[in-house]
């Protein structure tokens, strides 16, 4: 027995030595191969891209479902520290990037965004009655809150070279049969959603319609059509600490510029999507908390840069998840404000308060609509080509200085005597009365569906 064991033992060092040599050769060969691959990839990337000082970050977007890959931002989230901006940028590639932007026959025939407002006192306008919509928001119900001049409800948008498709609620429901229509964005997009619900609900029996409680996602349901008209509160499109639909007035605005995970998990299965974002970027700066950051450290950038990152993350989701033959995506351009009457009435000192008629000056453009931001948005949308249709509300809404609630709405905070003596000081010249301008935005959506 001992002799057999000795013979086996004497053969083991030789076999072991051969095994070690083979493994060592394989490791060295693979390391060299990996180095060559990395070198080739780096050279290839450098050839594809101009030299840049930026680090490009792939957006964190879901392909199936939101799995909670990182701590979700909420209104209690804080920056433990704020450091200098690292220069990271959102890098995304549309797998079908070579497609040109397609123009429909309708768009070739007529630009429905170029036109004028025509007063229409017929029974056709307004398209719905404020008092007959049980889902009306007190923020938009101007007549209920004391506005006596109702001419703002009777202005009809008339394109220069053609007619806008006439609104028909039954036809719209047929387009939506078996589908989910979802508005995603801020309070202006919520106003458009409320307008759409008010336009549609009148033809549905009361016992065949329902509205879910106000939440991150709020849903109006029409049973007979097996259809929903929904609103998702996502004012910055990417994840942020302002994503609570009620408690979102915070002194410090924090976003994850590389993540639409939380919101996209709600919107990804909708059939028709209407996005907007702009108002919440109208401040000096925003803080960035990247998905890879685990210690609560933030970077600070100008809001315009933050918006561009958010648009790029959103664009990456659209590029990789939208088949325009199966899902329709619309982007609504910026909604203008009318904070300074001197812009349309030189020498005056006021805002939209007391205004009763639209601006008549052709191509009027106020300071409430930022042209560099429009150009940035256009750049993103052009890359997406036919995957996104644009509803350009900006110019046509610029004329409507008379369409805002001003003082005729519910204010959530009590007003002191000094402010009450000066109505212009607390006038809302950002949102829009309903019925009113948002109905035309929805008429444009109906036109393109």
UniProtKB/Swiss-Prot annotation:
A Pfam family assignment: PC-Esterase
GO cellular component: Golgi apparatus; membrane
Name of this protein: Protein trichome birefringence-like 35
Bilayer topology term: Single-pass type II membrane protein
UniProt motif (DCXHWCLPGXXDXWN motif) ranges: 428-442
Source organism superkingdom: Eukaryota
GO annotation, biological process: xylan biosynthetic process
Organism: Arabidopsis thaliana
């Amino acid at each position: 027995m001992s002799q057999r064991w000795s013979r086996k033992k004497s053969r083991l060092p030789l076999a072991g030595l051969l095994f070690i040599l083979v493994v060592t050769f394989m490791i060295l060969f693979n390391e060299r191969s990996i180095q060559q691959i990395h070198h080739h990839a780096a050279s290839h990337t450098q050839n594809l891209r101009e030299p840049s000082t930026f680090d490009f970050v792939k957006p964190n977007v879901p392909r199936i479902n939101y799995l909670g890959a990182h701590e979700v931002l909420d209104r209690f989230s804080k920056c433990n520290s704020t450091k200098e901006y690292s220069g990271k940028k959102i890098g995304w590639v549309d797998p079908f990037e070579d497609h040109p932007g397609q123009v429909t026959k309708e768009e070739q025939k007529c630009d429905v965004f170029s036109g004028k407002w025509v007063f229409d006192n017929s029974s056709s306008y307004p398209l719905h009655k404020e008092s007959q919509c049980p889902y009306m928001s007190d923020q938009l119900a101007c007549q209920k809150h004391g506005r006596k001049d109702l001419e703002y409800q009777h202005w009809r948008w008339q394109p220069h070279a053609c007619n806008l498709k006439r609104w028909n609620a039954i036809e719209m429901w047929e387009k939506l049969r078996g589908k989910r229509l979802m508005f995603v964005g801020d309070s202006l997009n919520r106003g458009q959603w409320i307008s759409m619900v008010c336009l549609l609900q009148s033809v549905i029996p009361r016992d065949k319609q329902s509205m879910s409680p106000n939440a991150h996602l709020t849903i109006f349901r029409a049973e007979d059509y097996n259809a929903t008209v929904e609103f998702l509160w996502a004012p910055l499109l990417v994840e942020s600490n302002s994503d609570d639909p009620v408690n979102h007035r915070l002194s410090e605005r924090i976003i994850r510029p590389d993540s639409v995970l939380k919101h996209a998990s709600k919107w990804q299965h909708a059939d028709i999507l209407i996005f907007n974002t702009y108002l919440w970027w109208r401040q000096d700066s925003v803080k960035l908390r990247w998905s890879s950051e685990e210690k609560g450290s933030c970077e600070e950038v100008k809001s315009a840069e933050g918006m561009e990152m958010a648009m790029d993350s959103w664009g990456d989701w659209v590029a990789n998840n939208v088949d325009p033959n199966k899902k329709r995506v619309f982007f609504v351009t910026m909604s203008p404000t009318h904070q300074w009457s001197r812009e349309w009435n030189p020498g005056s000192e006021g805002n939209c308060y007391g205004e009763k008629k639209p601006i008549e000056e052709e191509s009027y453009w106020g300071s409430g609509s930022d042209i560099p931001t429009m150009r940035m948005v256009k750049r993103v949308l052009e890359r997406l080509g036919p995957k996104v249709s644009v509803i350009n509300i900006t110019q046509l809404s610029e004329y409507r200085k008379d369409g805002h609630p001003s003082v005729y709405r519910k204010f959530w905070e009590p007003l002191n005597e000094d402010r009450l003596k000066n109505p212009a000081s607390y006038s809302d010249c950002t949102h829009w009365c309903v019925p009113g301008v948002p109905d035309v935005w929805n008429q444009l959506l109906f036109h393109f569906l």
